[in-house]
């Protein structure tokens, strides 16, 4: 395998991501991992390689305790898979060879692996038995099928949720709330993000310091959005009352799947149930577009009401 700069080969890298089985594709793609590396991760050195069977997307760092380590480009949530390629057996053998030939690491973290997936099985066969193997905490994502369009999606939701959405639609209509899609070119990405931030600043998330109004999380999405716009991936909806934005929902599509990223609403209008209505209108638009699945992201209680499938990945930690 040869060293590479992922940013320089991002389009080819993403094509391989699209063909890689049993991974979180969007969160392994260049838009997600490069933004995370720049905004959320500590300083590290590149450790990415390309070979005949695919890519190894990783970085090398030194822990404060002094030991060197290898980890995926994104490890803020551990969603990104570092082994990218359609031939898991060949790729695992190549990656094992790279790791065995290098003496500049003591611990290697391989995240984003499904426990019974082809990458994990191939690694079990390819890695030297003398290396200690540990399993990290699993990461869960909630995923909803959009099969059957909006009617099919709603039929798989609870009666209580459907009732809440109908009530919210009536309240929003009475309040003069409308919903509109916002597409943007790369040059318009900053303006779109400022519009998103205008809503975010008036949300309960900003008040409690858990949103994206400041700090690394603000930078993360600010770096990601131009890449999404450049490839036509971003999907943003706004809830509006006259000329005022009351709420937004932001996500991205990749290979027939939508990944929800963020949504917020003006806290003064919480009674309208805008969070659920933004989700509903986004699902409606996605169904019309022919998107097959909606990945709501990592574990949160409310997501269980909106999804029926759980994707679980885990972390393999190697110590030598």
Task: List each model region and its residues.
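A conserved beta-strand-loop-helix scaffold within acyl/acetyltransferase catalytic domains
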Residues: 2-69, 112-141, 148-271
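Non-catalytic surface loops within mature trypsin-like serine protease
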Residues: 86-87, 146-148, 320
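Acyl-donor binding region in acyl/amide transferases
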Residues: 62-137, 255-310
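Acidic/polar loop patches that form or flank catalytic/metal-binding clefts of enzymes
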Residues: 207, 236, 292-296, 312-313
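Conserved catalytic-core motifs of GNAT/GCN5-like acyltransferases
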Residues: 134-143, 310-320
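Residue-level "edge-of-site" marker
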Residues: 185, 299, 316
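Short alpha-helix boundary/capping motifs
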Residues: 41, 224, 307-315
């Amino acid at each position: 395998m040869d060293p590479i700069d992922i940013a320089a080969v991002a389009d080819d890298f993403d094509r391989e991501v699209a063909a890689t089985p049993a991974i979180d594709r969007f969160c392994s793609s260049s838009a997600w991992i490069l933004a995370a590396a720049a905004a959320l991760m500590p300083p590290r050195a590149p450790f990415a390689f390309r070979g005949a069977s695919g890519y190894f997307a990783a970085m090398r760092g030194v822990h404060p305790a002094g030991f060197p380590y290898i980890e995926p480009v994104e490890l803020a949530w551990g969603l990104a898979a570092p082994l990218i390629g359609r031939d898991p057996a060949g790729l695992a053998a190549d990656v094992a060879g790279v790791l065995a030939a290098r003496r500049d690491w003591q611990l290697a973290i391989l995240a984003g692996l499904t426990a019974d997936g082809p990458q994990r099985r191939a690694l079990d066969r390819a890695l030297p038995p003398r290396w200690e193997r540990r399993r990290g905490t699993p990461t869960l994502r909630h995923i909803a099928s959009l099969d059957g369009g909006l009617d099919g999606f709603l039929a798989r939701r609870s009666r209580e949720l459907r009732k809440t959405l109908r009530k919210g639609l009536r309240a929003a209509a009475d309040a003069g709330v409308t919903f509109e899609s916002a597409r943007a070119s790369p040059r318009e990405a900053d303006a779109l993000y400022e519009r998103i931030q205008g809503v975010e600043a008036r949300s309960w998330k900003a008040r409690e310091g858990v949103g994206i109004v400041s700090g690394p999380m603000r930078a993360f999405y600010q770096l990601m959005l131009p890449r999404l716009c450049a490839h036509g991936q971003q999907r943003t909806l706004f809830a509006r009352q006259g000329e005022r934005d009351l709420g937004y929902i932001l996500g991205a599509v990749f290979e027939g799947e939508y990944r929800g990223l963020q949504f917020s609403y003006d806290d003064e209008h919480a009674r309208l149930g805008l969070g659920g209505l933004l989700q509903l209108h986004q699902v409606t638009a996605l169904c019309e577009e022919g998107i097959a699945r909606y990945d709501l992201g990592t574990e949160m209680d409310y997501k269980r009401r909106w999804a029926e499938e759980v994707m679980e990945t885990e972390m393999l930690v190697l110590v030598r």
